């Protein structure tokens, strides 16, 4: 406790106004003292487990399972608690029951001959496991995690030892009564959910919830129910956020990507976006065009020829609209320095060629029915009407707006948390490895100041509805964050979408990465970034996503001698043949850092019926000799400040600077 005497009493007097407010919450020496004791005890608890996941790309089945099994944490807890006293098949079944209690119980009820015995054994096991996973938390925190229906019973069972002679009958009778009154199934579901909740104290999603997968909206719905989460926006998230804000270029990009991968379920079923006007438009303008280069890329999708033809026409129609809308932004914002992406005016329709960087290329598709040679970036009347309808659909989708507000409320471009720096893409660098200076709004920025400014502009794009000029600039910046040359989310010099559709020469398809990726193995670069973000280089890590780790080719996700960790989740099935695995996740618990690599997930159905889990292997990156405590974390720093304030309040009471409330008044 800080000792205050006559020499430093002025500190308390300077803070007297604040301390009087604090005294409303702690109106006596007794209440302030109790809170200090409580907070001091919390500081000495083990730090909670953090779970890091990145690049989900809409693959909701794999993600849902990863969330439920906490990247193998639950299985490790089962091993720790039961060791060799349980067969491997029993451990597997117990784990599956915790992941999917409702579905697994339905199967067990059909197959188990002596259900009462099974209930009794399972309840004892679940309670024992829950006692272990809850042991690092205060009773108050555990109590808040319990479902109201069973809160009292679970709390009693967690705080009683079934092997204590004086309480054994009491403990056993609770379990027997649960079974006798036919509430065992509901209790198993409740305690399984409590275990799932308590094994992970904090969830970090390092970008790209959205993309080509079929269930981004399912993922966000699940995340919105999570007890403690933060999100670092990815490039695919930002383009959806821009679309929800009303940025027309972002809307066109979102629709184009969905059509490219024949994934319309998120748009149509998830968010109720009406694509019929686009289908009508595409059939009118591209009726005789087979749109060969716009056929959707499909994995595990059975589409008939009619569907493919329609999707191809819609895909081409929205792509041309996208290039026009992007051209308007590039012309409106010369500070973006993206003039080389103005390609529509470089097309020679008569010759069927494109002048790209003073070199002539043959176009593989020369049908541009909506292109005006004199004004190639102008939308025709039908296109303008279509864009307005699509924009209204995005702006008026209640579910989309709710989900995007969730991303804003819980997300940011980067996060400093417990000495780790989390961001999705990169910190823009020059070729020599120094921080890249970027001019925005007449300010020249780099590193942390650049990301802080971009974060503010992204919020203005959505929330500045009464300031049209600021909102428009923010929306243009959202598009820049998606594909701009100095975007920390994109991390490349240019996005060659047009070239991939219209040119055969593969050299024109290349997208040069920011020099950041060249220096990822350089400890000096990491140290420079830590200093820029005011972190201790000796005790910090950069946790990064965005670029899949090509494990098959021998690439290591651990960079710069462990200073930088790449955990692209690898959920996207299209990348798995290139990477050789289904990506990496990270666990940071009180014992250290564990990097887990995962094999591809089969399906939730197989996980429930056959007990198939994601096959994972874990690498211990750092192991501490003494467990990290809450006092070693960011939360610990906040608690220390609270304790300091309460200590000042105690002195203020004892010196008579603030009067205690009458005990009778406090009680009544």
Curated annotation (Swiss-Prot):
Catalysis: reaction(s): beta-D-fructose 1,6-bisphosphate + H2O = beta-D-fructose 6-phosphate + phosphate
Q: Does the keyword Manganese apply?
A: yes
Q: What is its EC number?
A: 3.1.3.11
Return the InterPro entries for the record.
Answer: FBPtase_class3 (IPR009164), Metallo-depent_PP-like (IPR029052)
What molecular functions are annotated in GO for this chain?
Answer: fructose 1,6-bisphosphate 1-phosphatase activity
One of its GO biological process terms is: gluconeogenesis
Q: Which cofactor does it need?
A: Mn(2+)
User: Enzyme class, one word?
Assistant: hydrolase
Alphabetized, the UniProt keywords read:
Carbohydrate metabolism, Hydrolase, Manganese
**Per its UniProt entry, which superkingdom is the organism in?**
Bacteria
Pfam families referenced in this protein's UniProt entry, alphabetically: FBPase_2
Pathway, per record: Carbohydrate biosynthesis; gluconeogenesis
Q: Which family does it belong to?
A: Belongs to the FBPase class 3 family.
In Swiss-Prot or TrEMBL terms, this protein is called Fructose-1,6-bisphosphatase class 3
Source organism:
Clostridium botulinum (strain Kyoto / Type A2)
Q: Which gene encodes it?
A: fbp
